[in-house]
Amino acid sequence: FKEWSDKDITNLVKHHRNHPSIVMWSIGNEIPEQWSQEGVQIAKHLQDICHQYDPSRPVTQGMDKAEDALKSGFAQVMDVPGFNYRVHKYYKNIEQLPQGFLLGSETASTVSSRGVYKFPVVVSDKATYPDGQCSSYDTEYCSWSNLPDDDWKMQDDYSWVIGEFVWTGYDYLGEPTPYDTYWPSRSSYFGICDLAGLPKDRYYMYRARWNEQQHTTHLLPH
């Protein structure tokens, strides 16, 4: 890290800074040094490099230990303080942020399998089934995460929640929560689309939310 971090950040920013899709830079995600003064100094240093080579864009990173990051001052030094999950803690977080706003840097982690519908329909953070699937009704999530509606309510009700990055757009190999020890489950259930890139039912919820120029109509079994 000491040998390559400055070079990597510099090359990253210089290579992509003219790309129109870049709205901010991220210097880390869930790093273990969130609680320490060493982490604060590293965050300041890497953020300064981003500012040096691109003064036009702010810098963020995703923090999963909100209490530690706020106590150490780690969150307070970021241009855009990003918090992963635990949306119910946003109220407490914002009280300690001089920036006056926060970002959902990793949100939702709702789990579902495309075309699989479980009955009875229940909201649960620990539902599992013998077939190793998750319900496509999008009522299931993890112990650390939440449903999309929780994120949207915070964004609608409080202007200091400036947006979100959803985990995740596509399913991927690895992290098969809630079936981490269940063979042959070997890929995630978090995706808005599945491994083949086909949209799950949740895709249409996000489309309706994000696409304000077109109507969204979607039918599913009940």
Tell where the protein language model's regions lie, with residue ranges:
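Extended substrate-binding grooves/exosites of carbohydrate-active enzymes
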Residues: 1-222
